[in-house]
Amino acid sequence: MLHTTQIRMVGTGSAFSKKFYNNSALVTFTNGYNLLIDCGHSVPKGLHDADIPLESIDGILITHTHADHIGGLEEVALYNKFVLGGRKIDLLVPNTLVESLWENSLKGGLRYSDTYDDLSLSDYFTVRSLKTFTSGAARTQLEENIAIKLYPTFHVSHMASYAVGLEDRGEDKVFYSSDTIFDEYLIDYALTYSWVFHDCQFFTGGVHASLDELLNYIPEEDQDRVFLMHYGDNMEDFFTKTGRMRFALQGRTYIL
């Protein structure tokens, strides 16, 4: 058993990054449960390069259905089923996304195989539907000492997307924004957690919070608890322009 929660950043890049893998984090809770948040198309390669075997992952949580967050699921599903002998891991999906994740994203590549016909998502994963609300936090108990809170985010019109609050042994430990525009109310929720991992872009406008918006809103005394992620390939140009916030670095493990 670990003494504290750990996060390893498998990828920290934006959807179009070529220097960094798709934004994804492997969370290890104090009871040893390994949860991968999001699995974009480049994440399986990121796991391989970080020497993280799929066998070590207990569950994957999906925050929304853009390809840089779900594009690696087909590979994971097929590898577990046909290389690892049908091993099923947890797939944690917001209840608003379960149907669309399969019908609109994964079904085309996973419905049929050379030995099986008309497969479903539950043939590959132990699907665990997570509660959602239209505002505020919806809490789902995952295991005895682990709970997941989902917060709806504004990312792209007509697409459900969620930030994630991670509770470990009763403590609101980590807030993980995934993808969101700048949202004062969401940041207020985030700052109730011990640590914050927030997406960041280097211009204002579009579908992510900008560095300037975060700098101007988050109090200086709270900025040292904030790590910036989901950034562009020009991240190094802004390395000294983040106030007391820091960039989450790909491959780095954060002991929280």
From Swiss-Prot:
Cited InterPro entries: Anti-Pycsar_Apyc1, Metallo-B-lactamas, RibonucZ/Hydroxyglut_hydro
SUPFAM superfamilies named among the record's database cross-references: Metallo-hydrolase/oxidoreductase
Subunit structure: Homodimer.
Beta-lactamase-like, as annotated region: 21-230
An annotated Gene Ontology molecular function: 3'-tRNA processing endoribonuclease activity
Catalytic residues, chain numbering: 74, 112
Chain residues that bind Zn(2+) 1: 68-69, 179, 230
Reactions mediated catalytically: 3',5'-cyclic CMP + H2O = CMP + H(+); 3',5'-cyclic UMP + H2O = UMP + H(+)
Function per UniProt: Counteracts the host Pycsar antiviral defense system. Phosphodiesterase that enables metal-dependent hydrolysis of host cyclic nucleotide Pycsar defense signals such as cCMP and cUMP.
Cofactor descriptive note: Coordinates 2 Zn(2+) ions. One protomer coordinates the metal ions and the opposing protomer provides the catalytic residues required for cCMP hydrolysis.
GO biological process terms on file: symbiont-mediated suppression of host innate immune response
Keywords: Host-virus interaction, Hydrolase, Inhibition of host innate immune response by virus, Metal-binding, Viral immunoevasion, Zinc
Protein name: Anti-Pycsar protein Apyc1
Cofactors demanded by this protein: Zn(2+)
Impact after mutating residue 112 to A: Partial loss cleavage of cCMP
Annotated Zn(2+) 2 binding sites: 64, 66, 155
This protein's record includes keyword Hydrolase: yes
Family the entry assigns: Belongs to the anti-Pycsar protein Apyc1 family.
